[in-house]
Amino acid sequence: MAQYALEAGVSWLATSVSVVASGTWQFAKWTHKYVMQQAEELEADEPEESYFQQMVDKEKEFHNYVRQQIICMWLFMLLYLFAYWLISRLKRKTEREALYAGEEDYFVYRVSVWISSTATATSIGSLTLLPFSVIGVELLQLYDGNYYLQWLSYSLIGALWNYVFVLSNVSLFVLLPFSYFFIESQGFSTSKIGNDMTQRIYEAMAISFLFAFVLLCLAEVVLTILDYPVSFLSITSVNLPLIYSCVSFIGAVLLLISTPYGFAKMFSLARDFLVTEETADIEEENSEQSEDVTEPKNSSSDETIHQVDRSDTPHLEDVVNDITENVDADGEFRKDSDSGIESGSTEEMRLNTDDEEMGINDSDDKSAFGDDGDLGNSTPTKNKKKRRKHDYAATTPIVRKWDKDVPKKPKNPNFDYRNLKEYVKEARRQRSSLSESDDYWFGSPPRSSFSANYYSSRFSRWKHNSETGLNPSSSLLVDPFASGDFHEASSSEASSTPLSPARRTKSEEAIWKPVLHTVKSSKLYKRAIEKQGRLVKLFMSLRFPVAAAALLVLTTCSLIMVATNTLKLLFGYRSLPVYAQYIEVHTRHSFGLFGACIETLLIIYVMITSFVGLYSLPVLRSLRPVRKDTPMPTIIINSSIVLVVASALPVAVNTVGMTTFDLLGSHSSLQWLGSFRVVVAYNTLFVVLSVAFLFNQLTASMRRQIWKWICQLRCGIRRESDADETIEILRGDKKSN
C-alpha cells in the first residue's frame, strides 16, 4: 500500500514538474514572441521614415532633372532663333541660287537652312559655354542657396557641356555633310522606289556614308604612320571622344594660327575704322569753317536778299519762337476733298529740292529784284524747273518776328539753345494735332482772320510766359474751331498727340529752309557749333589712341598668362588638363567675382580675335559671308568651319592657361591633352607667333618708311654717279673737238 502511495506521489510530482516546466516554457515562448514583436515594430518604423526620405529625394531629383531639361531646351531654342535670323540675313534668296530649279529645290533649301541653323546654334553655345560656366560657378559659390539662383546648378552646367559635345558631333559628322550633299543631289535615275525627293534623300545619305568612310580610311593611314595602338577600322575600339579628339586638334591648330594673327589684325581694323573716319570728319569740319569764314564777304548781298541789317539779326530764342509759330500757322496743309491730295498753302511748296543748298525761299528771291526787274547784288542761283502750280486760294505771306514792322520781344532768361531739338519736336507735334483735326479741314474760317488771331494769341502767350519766367517751349494745343475761340491745353494733352509720319513732306522742308538758314547764321548758334566742334575734334583725336591702348592691354595680359602657364608647366607647378567629372571647389577663381569677370573678358577677346584672324587668312578670306549675297553651300561650309573652331575654343583656352576652370564632360578626355610635349609646344608656339605677328604689324609702317628712305638714298647716289659720268663724257667730247 505504501508502495502504491509512493509511486502515486512520484508520478504526481513528475506530472506537476512537467506541467510547471511546460507552463514555464510556454510563458517563456510567449514572452520571447512579445519581445520580438515589439522589436520588429520598432525596426519597422525606421525603414518607413528612411523610405519616405528616399522618395522625397527622388522627387526633388526628378523635378530638378525636368527643370534642367526645360532650361536647356529654352536656351537651345533662343540660340536657334538667333542663328536662323543670322543666316537669313546672310544667305542669298533661294530664287537666285545657282542650283535652284523649282519648288522641289525650295524644300531642299529649307531643310539645309534648318540644319545650318542647328549647327550655328551649337557653335554659339560652344562659344558662350566657358564664360557662362566661369561666371555661373562663381555665383553659385558666392551666393549659395540664393532664391534667384535656384535655376542654376552644377548639374545644369555639366548637362550643358554634355549637350554641346553631343550636338557638335551630330552636326559635324551627320547633319552638315547630309545638308551639303542634299543640295548637290539629283536622285538615282535608275531606281523606281519612291518619288524624286525620296531619291535625292537616298543619294545624299549614300554619298555622306562614302564620305565618312573615306575620312576614316585617311585617319587610319595617319594613325598607322604614328604607330597609334587604336585603329579606326576596329569598331570595338573606336569611341566618340577619340574621333572628336582629332577634330578638336584640327580646330586647335586653326586657333593657333588665327588667334595670333587676329591680335595683330585688331590694330589694323581699329586704325581703318577710326583713323579714316576721323580724317573725313576733320575735312568736313574744315570745309564748314571755310564756308563760315566766307560769309562776311557777301554781307551786302545777304542784306539785299533778306532786306535785313546784320545788326538786327534775331537771337536764337526769337528764331525758335518763329519756328513754332510758322510751323503751326503758315505750315498748314489743305486737303482736296475730291482727290484726297495734300498740298501746301505757302509759296515754299513750289520749291524744288535742288534749292535746299541755297537756304532761301521764293519770297526772299523776289525781294532781291529791283522795280525794273534787274538783279541787284544778289548771287546767281540755279535755274529752277517750272512746275504746275496748284489751283488753290492765294497764299498768305510769311510774317516773321524780326521784320521791322513787328515789335521786338524781350529775351527770356530761361531760354537754352541746347534744347532746340525739343522745341522743334514740340512745334511739329502741335502742327500734327492741328492737321489731324476734322474741323480743321471742313468749315474752316477765312485764312487771313485765322492767321491774325492765331499770331496775336501766340504772341500774347509768349509775352505772358516770358514775364512769369516760363519756358518758351511749353506746349500749346490750339483748337481754333472749338466754341469759336482759342484755348490752351496742358503739356500732357499736347504730348499725347502723336506725330504723323505722313506729314513729313517736301513742303515741310521748304517751309523750314529760311528759318534754318537764319538759325545757322546767328552768332549764338555759331558759338555753340564751335564749342561742340572742339569737343568732337577732341573725341575724334582721342578715340583711336584709347582703343589702341585697350587692345594693347588685353593682348599683353593674354600673352603674359600664356607665358606664365608655359613656365608653370615646365617647372611642374601646374599639371596637364585632366578629366574632371564633377565641378569641385578648386574651380573657384582666386580673385573672386572680379577675377572671374576679367577672365571672362579675356576669353571673349580671344574669341573675337580668333574669328577676325580666321577670316583674314588668305585661304579663308574668299569664304567670308556677304550680307544677302552668300550662297547656301558657302553658308554650310562656314557653319562647319565655325563649329570646328568653336568646339576647340574651350580646350585651347584651357590649354594655354587663360582659365582655371576645369573642362567638363568628354572635352577633358581628349587624347592629345595628355601629351606633355604637345601642350608645351602649343603654348610656346602661341607666344612666339603672337609676338612675331604683333612686331610685324606695329613696325610695318616704320619699316616701310626706312626702306623708302634707303631706296631714295640709293637712287640719289645712282643719280649723282650718273651725273658725274655724264659730265666726264661731255668733257671728253669737248676736248676731242
UniProtKB/Swiss-Prot annotation:
Pfam families according to UniProt: LMBR1
Region (Disordered): 280-416
One GO BP: signal transduction
Record-level Gene Ontology MF annotations: transmembrane signaling receptor activity
Basic and acidic residues bias: start-end ranges: 303-318
Annotated signal sequence range: none
UniProt cross-references to InterPro entries, sorted A to Z: LIMR, LMBR1-like_membr_prot
Residue ranges, compositional bias (Acidic residues): 280-293
Gene Ontology cellular-component annotations: plasma membrane
Family note: Belongs to the LIMR family.
Name of protein: LIMR family protein R05D3.2
